[in-house]
Every structure is written in C-alpha cells, then in structure tokens.
C-alpha cells in the first residue's frame, strides 16, 4: 500500500485527504473506481457530446424550450375570435380614463416612494426580457439549423409578418372604435340647452354629426369583419405550414437516431479490440515523461529561486551598506566637529605654550642648564602640530567625498523632476482631449435643444390655427362648450410640451455638469493609476534602493528642518523675553489705571479667543468624522454603481449579440431597441443624478472644512510653530508606517517562497519514490508466468472500508490557532492602513491642497 498525489474534482474531495504537498488517496480505491467507470456502458447523450466535441452541460429531460416550436404558434388572438355584440351604449362604461389614471398613479407612487425598489423592479424586467429574447434566438437558430430551407421557411416568415401587420391594424381599428363610442357618449351626456318659447332651436348640426358617426361606425364594422376573415385565412395557412414542419422534423430525428446507433456499434467494436497491457504501458510512459518534465521544471524553478534569493541578499546587503554609510557619515560629521574643537583647544594650548616658552627662554638665557629641556619640549610641540595637520587633511578629504555624494544625489533628484514634468505634460494632453470631447457633446446637445425649440414653435403655430378654427365654429354652432373644452385641452397639452422642453433643457445642463464631474473623476483615476504604476515599477531593486536613498535624504531634511525650527523657537523666545522686560519697565514707569484696564481687556479677549479655538477644534473633529462617514458612503455607492454599470454593460453586450445573430431587422425589433435604449438612458440618468448629489455633498463638506481651517489659521496666526511641528510629526509617522508595511510584505513573500520551495522538493521526492515502487511491483508481474488474479488477502474488510485517517486534536488546534493569528494580522493591517490614509489626508489638508 502506498499513497499517490492527485488533484481531485469537487464531488470527489471526500475520498481524499489534504496535506501541504497535495491530496492523497489509496491505490486500491482508485483502481476500483476506474473499474467501476469502465464497467458502466456509455450513454447516448455522452457519446453524442464526445463525437460533436461540445462540452456543454446536458439540458434537462423536461425542458423543451430549445426544441419547441411554440414561438411560431404564439399569437395575440384567441383560437376563435369573439363576436362583437354591440350592447346598449348605456351598458358600456363611459369614462375609463380616471380608473386607469388612478391605477397608474398608485403604481408610480409605490415605486417613487422607494427608488431602490424601482431600480430593482426595472432590472428584473430587463432580465426577464433579456432571457425571453435569448430563448427565442436560441430556438430560432436551432430550428434554422435543423430544417432545410426549400422556400417554405421564407413563406412562413412572410406570413408571420403579414399576421403582425393585420394585428396592428386590428388594434388601431379597435382604438378608433372606442374613441368614437366615447365621443358619442359625451354627446349624449351633454344636457340640452333650455329651449326658448319664441325661437325654436336648430339641431341640424347634431343630426349631421350623428349621421357621420353612424356611417363611420358602419365602416369600422365592415373593416373589422374583413380583418377577422383575413386573420382566419392566415391562421389556416399557418396550421398547414406547421404540419409540414413537424413532418420534416420527424424525418430528421429518425435519420439522427440511425446515425447514433451506427456510431455506438463502431465505438463498441473499437473498445473491445483494445488491450489492458497497452493501456498500462501507456500510463507508465506518461508518468515517466511527466517525471522528467517535472524534474526539469523543478530544476529551473530552483535556479530561479536561487537567483531571486541572491538578488534579495544583494538588496539587503546594499540596504545594510547604505545604513552603514549613513552612520559612518554621521560619525565622520561628529568626528569633524570634535576635531575642530580639539584643533581650537590645541591652538589655545599652543599659544599658552608659546607664551610659557618665551618666559622660560628668558629665564633659560640666564640659566644655561635648562636648554636641553626646552629643546625636548619644542620637538614634542612640533610633532603634535604635524599630527594635527594630518588629521585636518583627512577630515577635509572626507568632507570632499561627502560633497560629491550630495551632488550625485542632487542630479538624481533633477532626473526625477524631469520625469515628473513629462508625466504632467501627458496629463495636460489628456485633459485637452477631454475638453474637445466635452465641446463636441455640448454642441450636439445644443443642436437637440434648437430642434426642440423649432418643434415648440411649430406646435404653437398649429395651436393658433386650431384656436382660429374653433372660434369660427363656435360663432356659427350652438355646441360652444365642447369647443372651449377642446381648446383648454389643447392649451394643457401645449403647457405640458413646454414643461417637457424645460425639463430637457435642465437635463442638458445636468449632463454638462456631469460631464465636467466625469472629467474630474477621470483625472483623479488617471493620477491614481499612474501612482500605482509608479509603485509597481519601484519594486525593482535599483529603483527600490533609489527610493530608500530618497527616504534617508528626507529624514535628514526633516532633522535639519527640526534644528532650524528649534533655533527659530529659541530666537522667538529671546525676543519674547526682551519684549516682556521692556513691557515691565514701561509698566513700572507709567503706573496709570488705563494701562491696567487695557491689560484686563486684552486678557479677556485672549480667553474668548481660546474658547473659540477650542470650539473650532471640536467642530473640526466633528467635520472630519462626518467627512470620513460621507467618504465611506461614497465608496459604498461607488461599488453599487460599478455593479449596476457592469450589469448594464453585460445586458447591452448580450443585446448587441442577439441583434447580430437575429434575422433581418423589422419594425418590432426597432421598437424593442428603442424601448431598451430608453430604459438604459433612464437608468443611466438616475444613477448619474445620485452620483452628482453625492459629489455635491462631498464638495460642500470639503469647502466647509477648508473654511474652518482658514478661520483657524487667521485666529491662530500667533502660534505657527505648533502646527508646523504637528505636520512634521505626521509626516514622520506616515513614512515610518509605510516603511513597516513594506518590511512586512517582504517578510511574508520570503516565508511563502520558502514554503513553496519545501513543498516542491518534498513532492518531487514523493513522486520519485512512488515511481520506483511502481517499477518494482510491475517488473516481476510482467516476467512471471504463474501470475493469477486470485489472491488470499490477509487484511480484514474493515481495513479497506476506511476512507482516510481520522483527524487528531493537535491538527484541529493548530488550525484554529492559525486562523486566530491570521485574523489578528488582518486587523493590524487594517488599522495601519486606516492610520496611513488618515495621515495622508491630514498632511494634504495641512498643505492647503486637495488630493481626492
């Protein structure tokens, strides 16, 4: 018994055990599974899929959507057209408009109260329409592939087109009939004017209208009868065509069944002639080839890993060397300072010695016995002087080397600035292109507005002509009320059209604003992408070392800035003390009551200013919290928007595919396309409006923040050093956190690399051992002639019933501990990232610039 490595499928993972090397399964279970698979006869559907080369999922048995022809039988008419029994006009409902309007208003109110539900409702409708169109297209394609075209298919399609045309005519006639009925009802409902006794009323106009209506009713009924007759003939022709299609389909299925049976016979004859020994040899050869390939790949991988390790070590050595050089430079600077101090001290001592020696010489001239001592002292002094000069020369040489290094770093900084200027030029070019696009869109929108205005003028002219006609009729006819009502209705329609034109103009303005916001977003996203690209490019060793050098330079600059700030602080303190002393002197000189009152007023003003400062700081903190919340909401909305836009893009792509795969376009397809485009534009407008609202809120909050910061800067002009110190501390914390983050990433990558190397080595060793065992077990079986399948196994059946080793408590405990550690690591990572983002924003606001 030996274990073999494999990558199981999803439904076979229960039979395997997971290890760091791979999934393990026993040999006998694998062989039994192979035998079970060989024993099972192949199904007809599987053989068809294997012959055709299609690896799609099999459809369900009960699903006949792909093979059904019910799409060609669908009509908006019933099997038998109902007779149009004209009841009395009083029995028919006279005005259905208010009921329909109330139902529509209810649905609109329910949807308008909840915009998310409205959006979901629209998406569900789009999905349903998309699914129905896809099913229709698939069934049409399958039907067209299965049926041979002898001219009858075109006839059937033409008949379907005629049917649709007759349907539209039928609907139009019904609508006209309903309108005439409504007009007839309105005429009946009108109360007759009070008759005068002296002058009899003329009803000739009403009688003429009634006669015209009756003639129009008769014409519509005759047209309806004709339409019904044509529809019945067309349906009969459709039934005949369907019968022909069904016969052809039956013949095609019979031929397919015959071909499948022949294929099954051929495959069974081929499978019976194959030998088991050839299969075993082929398997062994495959394993050998795989082993050789794996050894080759593992060798190349190890070489690459060694190279990567060498490069990483080189990077680490360079980093350590850089740090050592920095420390060495700092030590040299300290030594320079100490050497200068020692030189000055030695100069002082030298002068003292010279003075002492001159005194001693004067005394020694008197006493010749002390000449030897003086000579020795002079020699010692000369030697000390020479040593000091050598020290000075070495220190000057080191200073020159440091100056050269500083110049090289300055040249690198100049190259970086040139690259930055190039990137800025590219960004400006992109902005120009966006401006041109925006101008083109604005011109198109202006053209649309002009067309709408022309339409409005035409409608106004038609309205005037209608008014003139109605006035003429109202003077001659007694039905003046009806004409006035029609005039008011037309005026309302004109007002509604004007409102729609205003709405369209407002939407144009909104689109222009949204285009500007989209430009700004594009710039931001481009800058973010460029920053990411720069970060990705900076992962190379040379650029990484350059960045680390820049970091060290920045640290030195920060230290120098801190020193200068401390000096400035000391100067300001000295000035403050001097001013304080002068002020106290003035107070001692002029002990008047006015000065004391002014002092008290100033103190009160200081207290009030301090209170205002505290209030402003609290408000600033609250505003920052609100800003963070708004940004989180904005990010959530952006994610929702991305999902919706991805869904819309998917729907539009599939719609284009369906349009391309569908037959020649017709009136119905054009109407569907227009509906889809309207829905898509409505959805897009709603989403853009929401985005615009969020962006406006964000801009308002940031403006408020900027105003607050400006007020604080005006109020706190007396204490600039505190803000500078805090900004410096924030920068130091930001760079420290970024550095620790990069170190953690490098450590994680190193651990993963080491683990993968170990796993690859162990897996290659296991594979080699398994292949050696296979060779040892198979070689005696091939040579021996007394090999029999029957073998008395000494193991119990319960031994083979086990599917794997039971889990130990230690493994579960280690797994739980690793999960806890992973959770803690993710929490730390999240906190650090939040801190980095907060510091970045704080630094940006401190420098009076916006980076969002």
From Swiss-Prot:
Family: Belongs to the SPC110 family.
Coiled coil, from the record: 158-711
Record's function text: Component of the spindle pole body (SPB) required for the proper execution of spindle pole body (SPB) duplication. Potential role in cross-linking filaments or anchoring other molecules. It is essential for growth.
Protein name per UniProt: Spindle pole body component 110
Major localization class: nucleus
UniProt GO MF annotations: chromatin binding
Keyword line: Coiled coil, Cytoplasm, Cytoskeleton, Nucleus
Domain of life, source organism: Eukaryota
An example Gene Ontology CC term for this record: cytoplasm
Subunit-level organization: Homodimer.
Localization annotation: Nucleus; Cytoplasm, Cytoskeleton, Microtubule organizing center, Spindle pole body
Record flagged with keyword Iron: no
Gene Ontology biological process terms from the UniProt entry: mitotic chromosome condensation
Coiled coil as UniProt keyword: yes
């Amino acid at each position: 018994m030996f274990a073999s490595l494999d990558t199981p499928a999803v439904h076979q993972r229960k039979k395997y055990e997971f290890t760091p090397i791979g999934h393990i399964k026993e040999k006998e279970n694998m062989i039994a599974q192979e035998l079970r698979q060989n024993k099972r006869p192949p199904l007809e559907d599987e053989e068809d899929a294997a012959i055709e080369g299609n690896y799609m999922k099999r459809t369900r048995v009960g699903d006949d959507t792909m093979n059904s022809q019910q799409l060609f039988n669908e009509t908006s008419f019933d099997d038998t057209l109902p007779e149009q029994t004209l009841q009395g006009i009083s029995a028919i409902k006279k005005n259905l408009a208010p009921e329909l309007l109330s139902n529509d208003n209810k649905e609109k109110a329910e949807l308008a109260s909840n915009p998310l539900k409205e959006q979901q409702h629209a998406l569900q409708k789009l999905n349903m329409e998309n699914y129905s169109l896809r099913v229709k297209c698939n069934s049409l394609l399958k039907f067209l592939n299965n049926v041979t075209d002898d001219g009858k298919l075109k006839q059937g399609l033409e008949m379907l087109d005629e049917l649709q045309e007759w349907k539209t005519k039928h609907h139009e006639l019904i609508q006209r009939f309903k309108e005439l009925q409504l007009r007839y009802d309105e005429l009946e409902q009108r109360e007759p004017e009070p008759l005068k006794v002296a002058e009899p009323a003329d009803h000739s106009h009403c009688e003429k209208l009634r006669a015209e209506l009756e003639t129009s009713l008769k014409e519509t009924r005759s047209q309806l009868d004709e339409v019904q007759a044509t529809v019945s003939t067309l349906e009969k022709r459709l039934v005949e065509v369907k019968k022909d299609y069904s016969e052809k389909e039956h013949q095609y299925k019979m031929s397919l069944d015959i071909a499948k049976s022949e294929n099954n016979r051929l495959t069974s004859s081929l499978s019976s002639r194959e030998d088991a020994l050839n299969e075993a040899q082929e398997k062994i050869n495959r394993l050998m080839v795989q082993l050789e390939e794996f050894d080759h790949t593992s060798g190349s991988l190890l070489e690459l890993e060694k190279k990567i390790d060498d490069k990483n070590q080189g990077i680490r050595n360079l980093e350590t060397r850089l740090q050592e050089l920095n420390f060495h430079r700092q030590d040299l600077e300290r030594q320079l300072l100490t050497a200068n101090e020692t030189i000055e001290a030695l100069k002082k001592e030298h002068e003292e010695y010279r003075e002492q020696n001159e005194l001693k010489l004067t005394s020694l001239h008197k006493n010749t016995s002390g000449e030897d001592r003086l000579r020795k002292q002079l020699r010692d002094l000369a030697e000390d002087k020479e040593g000091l000069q050598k020290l000075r020369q070495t220190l000057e040489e080191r200073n020159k080397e440091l100056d050269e290094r500083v110049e090289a770093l300055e040249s690198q900084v100049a190259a970086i600035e040139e690259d930055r200027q190039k990137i800025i030029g590219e960004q400006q070019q992109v902005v120009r292109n966006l401006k041109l696009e925006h101008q083109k869109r604005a011109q198109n929108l202006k053209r649309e507005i002009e067309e709408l205005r022309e339409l409005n003028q035409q409608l106004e002219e038609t309205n005037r002509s209608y008014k003139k006609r109605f006035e003429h009729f109202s003077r001659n006819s007694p039905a003046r009320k009806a004409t006035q009502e029609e005039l008011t209705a037309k005026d309302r329609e004109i007002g509604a059209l004007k409102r729609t034109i205003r709405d369209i103009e407002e939407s144009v303005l909104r689109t222009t604003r949204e285009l500007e916001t989209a430009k700004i977003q594009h710039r931001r996203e481009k800058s973010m992408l460029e920053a990411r690209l720069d970060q990705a490019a900076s992962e190379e060793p040379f650029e990484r070392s350059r960045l680390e050098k820049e970091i060290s330079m920045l640290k030195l600059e920060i230290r120098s800035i801190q020193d200068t700030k401390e000096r400035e602080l000391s100067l300001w303190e000295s000035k403050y003390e001097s001013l304080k002393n002068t002020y106290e002197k003035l107070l001692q000189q002029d002990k008047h009551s006015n000065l004391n009152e002014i002092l008290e007023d100033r103190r009160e003003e200081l207290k009030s200013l301090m209170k205002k400062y505290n209030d402003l700081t609290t408000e600033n903190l609250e505003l920052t919290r609100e800003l963070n919340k708004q940004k989180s909401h904005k990010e959530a909305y952006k994610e929702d928007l991305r999902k919706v836009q991805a869904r819309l893009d998917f729907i539009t792509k599939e719609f284009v595919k369906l349009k391309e795969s569908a037959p020649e376009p017709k009136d119905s397809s054009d109407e569907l396309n227009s509906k889809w485009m309207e829905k898509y534009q409505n959805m897009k407008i709603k989403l853009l409006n929401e985005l615009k609202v969020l962006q406006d809120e964000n801009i308002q909050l940031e403006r408020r923040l900027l105003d607050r910061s400006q007020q604080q800067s005006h109020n706190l002009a007396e204490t600039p050093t505190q803000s500078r110190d805090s900004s410096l501390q924030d920068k130091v914390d930001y760079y420290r956190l970024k550095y620790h983050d990069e170190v953690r990433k490098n450590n994680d990558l190193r651990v993963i690399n080491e683990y993968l190397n170990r796993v690859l080595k162990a897996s290659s060793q296991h594979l080699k051992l398994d292949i050696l065992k296979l060779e040892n077990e198979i070689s005696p079986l091939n040579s021996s002639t007394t090999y029999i399948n029957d073998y008395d196994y000494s193991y119990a059946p319960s031994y083979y019933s086990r599917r794997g080793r039971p889990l130990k408590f230690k493994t579960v405990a280690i797994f739980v501990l690793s999960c806890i550690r992973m959770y803690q690591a993710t929490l730390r990572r999240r906190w650090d990232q939040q801190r980095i983002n907060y510091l970045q924003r704080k630094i940006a606001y401190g420098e009076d610039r916006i980076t969002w």
